[in-house]
Curated annotation (Swiss-Prot):
Keyword Cell division: no
Keyword Metal-binding: yes
UniProt binding sites for Zn(2+) 1: E35, D46, H117
Chain's role: Catalyzes the ring-opening hydrolysis of 3-dehydro-scyllo-inosose (diketo-inositol) to 5-dehydro-L-gluconate, and thus probably functions in a myo-inositol degradation pathway together with IolG, IolM and IolO.
GO molecular function terms noted in the UniProt entry: hydrolase activity, acting on carbon-nitrogen (but not peptide) bonds, in linear amides; metal ion binding
Name this polypeptide is given: 3-dehydro-scyllo-inosose hydrolase
PANTHER family listed in its UniProt record: 2-AMINO-5-FORMYLAMINO-6-RIBOSYLAMINOPYRIMIDIN-4(3H)-ONE 5'-MONOPHOSPHATE DEFORMYLASE (PTHR35005:SF1), 3-DEHYDRO-SCYLLO-INOSOSE HYDROLASE (PTHR35005)
Gene3D superfamilies: Creatininase
Amino acid sequence: MERPTGVYFQTMTMKQIRERLKQCDLIIIPVGSTENHGPNAPTGEDTFLVTRMAEQVALKTGCTVAEPIWYGYHPYHHIGMPGTVPVKDEAFIDYLVSVIAGFWNTGFRKQILLNGHGQEFVIPIAIHKFAKIFQVPAIIINLNWYHAIQDKFKTKEEGGPYETPFIHADEVETSWSLALFPEFMHQEWAVDTEPKGFLPEGHIDKAGNLLHRPIAWYGHVGGGPIEVVAYPEGVVGKATLASAEKAKEGVEALLDYLEKLVRDIMERFPAGKLPPAEMLSQRPKEELEALTKEPLTEGWRNLYTAGNLWG
């Protein structure tokens, strides 16, 4: 992420950023976490997954990648696990709002928050909070990578490559990590655990709600144990079954989808263009024109004059 690959916002000068905005004003913001993923995988696994994905798509499409959000939201059953760094709910949401606003004010009015962690139900709150505060035209999308290719997580019984369903630091997630950043993995240290639940199977879903069960994985407290007690290893499932080969088809499909998403947005709304402002906001026309001008040009108003971000 510190290498001058030509895709990361924080490695660019403002001159380079201005030139890039003329070609593509879409930025991908990887939203990850710092979380215990067992003895064999790095604590930044969720973050590395989405940064590697974003890098590949940016190299193909010309979009920009923000340095990732390293610390994320965590549900109750994650709390207390060493190696996991949870952020207070309100602080996480407000931090995302601030990041979205900062990039919008710079000229990136099209943003994809590419999520790699179990916080898919929180990120949309930040997107809508941004919209409510500022009420400016924008395309802000939350994409959870595992939702883009749900058919690629099938078990062998369903015609897929995996022995077990996707949970956490398990066969599936470890396979994807081996495919995307093998240099950080120590598969010789992998361990297995047995997933536990207090209700019969079929009610509560697992990671990403990929099984389409009635109750979302985050829609309960008490349906399963807390991780620090039940899974001190940091693994929920069979990490030893993982291999990069199992994830290969899914990785290719996901990158294809991400590339398509970026290209579809940019073809519909080329650099400098957005959906009709009058369809997205009831702010006065003159105000919207000033806010959406190229930053630092004549008549431009900075975004922070349009809403109170500071409470």
